[in-house]
Amino acid sequence: TLFRSDKATRSGVWNWQTGAPVFRIRGRVMGIVSFGKIGQAIAERARGFGVELMVYDPYISQSSIEKMGCRPVNKETLIRESDFLMMQAPMTEETHHFLSFDEFKLMKSNAIVINTGRGPTIDNKALYQALTQQEIAAAGLDDPEEEPAKRSSWDPKDNPIFSLPNVLVTPHAAYYSEESIRIARETAATQVAKMIRGEVPDYPVNPEVLNRQQN
């Protein structure tokens, strides 16, 4: 909407309806996939806009989700009922192509998918079909399935997603601010220092390695 209004205004069209239709966020349903610290932070901020919050995360207890003012649901319910679907999942065998052809066919035609997690959690071909056949309305991607930075050379034409007007793509930079860069570096340095001192790091993803070291 903002892009359409801006483009029209720059071309000499002064009309408040150039960005229409616009629908308010309040009262809409936001579904969040994966409810770790980032997912919880998203929920906390989204609540201020008056959205209904649903969460799918089989590794988080229902009571923990409910304490955050969210409704725990299964995958199908989340996909069917979400107006905004936030993908914040890590990349695992279980989450690979979490959204693919079957899932997009279940979604609302006005749904918007936003992926600020890992690119391969969404099937690129299925997403393209969903966007071009009006199965969903739009998508925001901070990381497509194949990240261009992982290729020695790339051309936007290699991925048809980049050609669509109803897709917003950022270069894996949705987290970025000068402050966040500083905090990320400080956090990494702090965890390395803990390991050197023989302490347990704060966020181990493979704690079994720590157990072997202790033995």
Labelled PLM ranges:
Residues W14-W16, W154:
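A residue-identity detector for tryptophan
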Residues Q17-S109:
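Rossmann-like dinucleotide/phosphate-binding beta-alpha-beta segment
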Residues V55, N74, M87, N115, ...:
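Hydrophobic residues in well-ordered beta-strands that form the structural core
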